[in-house]
């Protein structure tokens, strides 16, 4: 049974800010393995499992209700467990993980705030809480695995490159909730043909382009509009709106966090124009 959208739980803590890392940062963590824990970053949304009584409710970071899970064993007091909720993404469907919750932390346990305890102690408490609630055998609940920083490069290769995980999360050993957290995400780039523009709305209506209509050549030789790419500078927005014909037909590069089967990028953003590449070479990726 769904919750009324007017209802909001008393969520415990805001989602921590994560530093964005690159390959050099990850290599530094691997060189000092005892200082870091590494966890996989799944293609889901931040979720909080709020357990009270015989049920646990999954809520997003913005206070939106997502699901209710029956607890095999009732909670002794209010507990808040944190994880990623996978629902509706291509990756979740392919992996057979749609509508599942992947837990990685706990901040409230039986009514007691444990956010100030070390990352290692909270991990132990999380495992114990999942077992105590009977969620260790629940088909929708999983605990995110964790490794030392020494495994960073191998995890990037096997999980991110080969299995399509979104990236890796790094947590400093001995840290409290959100202290010294970082992430490294995989970035994909693709080249498209500009087949049109989308006008800005609101205060930008009549003043600039909101996004570029991206096209790819199909096997039958037709150029098909397959998605839209944002991330334009103010100057480019205005110029594309003023003289769209100057841009239509040109090749551009975009980046995103993943590639869908159709050839569209996840969270696409404009990178640059490609004067060196013919439009006919912009084809749907294999």
What are these regions (language model features)?
Residues 29-135:
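Covalent nucleotidyltransferase
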